[in-house]
A protein has these predicted regions:
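Conserved glycine-rich beta-strand-loop-beta hairpin in the small C-terminal domain of fold type I
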Residues: 2, 223-224, 240-249
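PLP-dependent enzyme catalytic core of the Aspartate aminotransferase-like
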Residues: 85, 93-95, 215, 279-320
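Short, conserved charged micro-motifs
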Residues: 101, 255-260, 305-311
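Short amphipathic alpha-helices in soluble, non-transmembrane regions
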Residues: 186, 259-266, 312-317
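Conserved C-terminal alpha-helix-loop-beta "cap" of PLP-dependent enzymes
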Residues: 242-297, 301
């Protein structure tokens, strides 16, 4: 783990650039983190300053004005917002049920495994049978549970801010490509547009990857236990859990009840995001409006004692 904050490096003795010469194109720390992420997913990885940055760079490098993206319904709200911002450049967006095949006549298929916050899993086999490139946002699954490139996907995307870095202190995104030529083209695009990751968050990512599997498996065990207990609670109407990972969502009666629950916890932090060592929950209507049920609460389970988390949830649910 090397933390090199330099922005320039000297040329060689012949006056030619070495592997690292200007930080907009490559840095030792970012390159080390990319190698590690690529090993985990089985492809060629590139880092970006955020998940949204990774999404924008990948889409803009692959598509042209007039092209259409098929986006999984109920996907992460931020992804739909990013794509909406790109529509002014002539890109079109259609949403589809990712548990079935994508629509025809699209130039890119975008899946989530599982979706956030509805926790549906895509039909990868149906998607990769389609001729358009397939991107799988595997932020929630992580390479611990799913390596989409092994199932025929062309690209994997991670908001590395979440589980990969895992400590709520590093903002990063990652794209992993099955094809090294496609990764090289994206690397050129990244350098030309300046959508580049810095050394410090890349170093924090390297730190987080050391404990990735331990964290993710512990979070998944605790989330499974909490999902089971939530299903038996009288104030909870619906529980969504994919059977792995530390993310789940559940519905209470309405938006007012959801606000009382989210502000009623003491151990679980009322905050956004997911995948960190600290458990957080929030009412998602705050951001997503009528895209989600009014009473939907998203819970990202951290590394705390699951019985203590349940006691905290029970106390908050008494206010629902």
């Amino acid at each position: 783990m090397t933390l090199d904050r330099s922005t320039i490096w000297p040329y060689d003795e012949h006056g030619e650039p070495r592997e690292f010469y200007y930080s907009r194109y490559a840095t030792p720390t970012v390159a080390e983190a990319e190698t590690r992420v690529g090993e985990l997913d089985g492809g060629a990885a590139l880092l970006f300053p955020s998940g949204a940055g990774a999404t924008s760079a990948l889409v803009l490098s692959l598509l042209a004005p007039g092209d259409t993206i098929a986006l999984a319904e109920g996907c992460y709200y931020g992804t739909s917002v990013t794509f909406g911002a790109l529509e002014k450049w002539g890109l079109r967006l259609v949403e589809f049920d990712q548990t079935g095949p994508p629509p025809k006549n699209v130039q890119l298929v975008w899946l989530e495994a599982p979706s956030n916050p509805f926790l549906t899993m895509p039909d990868l086999e149906a998607a990769v049978a389609y001729p358009a490139p397939v991107v799988v946002d595997a932020t929630v699954a992580t390479p611990v549970h799913l390596r989409p490139l092994e199932h025929g996907a062309d690209f994997v995307l991670h908001s590395a801010t979440k589980y990969l870095a895992g400590h709520d202190d590093a903002l990063l995104g990652a794209v992993v490509s099955r094809d090294h030529a496609a990764a090289d083209a994206l690397r050129v695009f990244r350098g030309r547009t300046g959508i580049v990751a810095a050394a410090d968050p890349a170093w924090l990512l390297l730190r987080g990857l050391k404990t990735l599997e331990l964290r993710v498996r512990r979070q998944g065990e605790s989330a499974g236990l909490l999902a089971e207990r939530l299903r038996g609670h009288p104030a909870v109407e619906v529980v969504r859990y994919a059977g792995f990972s530390g993310l789940l969502s559940f519905d209470v009666a309405d938006g007012d009840a959801a606000r009382r629950v989210e502000t009623g916890t003491r151990l679980i932090v009322n905050a956004t995001s997911l995948g960190g060592v600290t458990s957080v929950l929030e009412s998602r209507t705050r951001w997503e409006g009528d895209r989600v049920p009014a009473g939907l609460i998203r819970l990202s389970v951290g590394l705390e004692d699951p019985d203590a988390l349940w006691a905290d949830l029970e106390s908050a649910l008494a206010c629902a």
